[in-house]
Design a protein with these regions (language model features):
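Predominantly extracellular/luminal regions of secreted and cell-surface proteins
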Residues: 61, 65, 173-182
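Beta-strand segments within the central parallel beta-sheet cores of soluble alpha/beta enzyme folds
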Residues: 68, 246-252
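Short coil/turn connectors at secondary-structure junctions
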Residues: 32-35, 59-63, 103, 110-113, ...
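Conserved beta-alpha junction segments in alpha/beta enzyme cores
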Residues: 179-240
Length: 261
């Protein structure tokens, strides 16, 4: 029998999950594993003028407190854009790398300013309270028209007028010719600008990660709910300056993905 739109389909994967037999990242016991917490910038656009980590480092149960300065000192690489598209004029899009934490300027609210590694989550959260961060707020905008207006604050010097990509996937010449033919008949044409609202997927499970030393010295084992374990391994190997073969990514059940994982 051929199914049509709207007909129910028999799902084979649900019963195990409905019985509570799924295995998600939170179900994995890392043993005596440590916990990580992040201090995030409260401004949409600001300059980080001071960062004092010493009190947090002195807290009992804290193993590491680090900022982007520490990552730079350890030669941890930036995260690069994986997308490759061409602008309308045929030029390649300019790719800007992004540090894992704020390097002088944060460009969106929630950017990571510092990280804490501690015995448990409570200690890690307490250590965040001991970090003193000072900011110089900078002008920010919240819609696309304001972002490309004359005099708008520039997020990246590489992106003039805040335009990262001018991508066209249509036959502009053919479309214009069709409207011109319609105009010759005396019919009026109506123009409208359509701006898509920002859409953020929100799965029940966030994007947690468990990481630790692998079985062989110098290797890394990772558990995370991802729809792309190979790209995750490749990206992490690149920023950590490791051979990709030394990074093993294991994916348990994924608590909702929708493409963003």
């Amino acid at each position: 029998m051929k199914l049509k739109i709207g007909d129910p389909t028999l799902r084979l994967e649900d019963e195990r999950l409905l019985r509570g037999e799924g295995s998600f990242t939170d179900d994995i016991d890392p043993g005596d594993g440590l916990r990580v917490a992040f201090l995030r910038a409260p401004f949409a656009h600001a300059r980080l003028t001071a960062l004092d980590l010493e009190d947090a480092r002195a807290l009992v149960g804290v193993h590491l407190v680090a900022s982007q300065t520490d990552l730079d000192a350890d030669q941890v690489g930036d995260i690069t854009c994986a997308l490759s598209l061409q602008n309308e004029d045929g030029s390649d899009m300019v790719k800007v790398s992004k540090p894992a934490m704020v390097r002088e300027i944060n460009r969106s609210a929630g950017d990571i300013v510092a990280m804490v590694v501690a015995d448990n989550q409570q200690i890690a959260d307490d250590a965040l309270e001991l970090i003193e961060a000072r900011y110089e707020a900078m002008e920010a905008v919240s819609d696309v028209y304001a972002a490309i207006a004359d005099g708008a604050p520039q997020l990246y010097p590489e992106y003039e007028n805040n335009i990262a990509l001018n991508w066209v996937a249509a036959d502009h010449a053919g479309t214009s010719a069709a409207f011109a033919r319609v105009a010759e008949t005396g019919l009026e044409t109506v123009e409208v600008d359509v701006v898509n609202s920002r859409v953020i997927v929100n799965a029940l499970e966030t994007r947690p990660m468990i990481a630790g030393p692998g079985e062989r010295p110098g290797t890394l084992d990772i558990w995370c709910p991802t729809q792309g374990p190979v790209p995750i391994a490749q990206k992490l190997a690149a920023v950590l300056n490791m051979p990709v073969a030394d990074v093993r990514v294991r994916t348990p059940d994924v608590g909702g993905g929708f493409g963003y994982k």
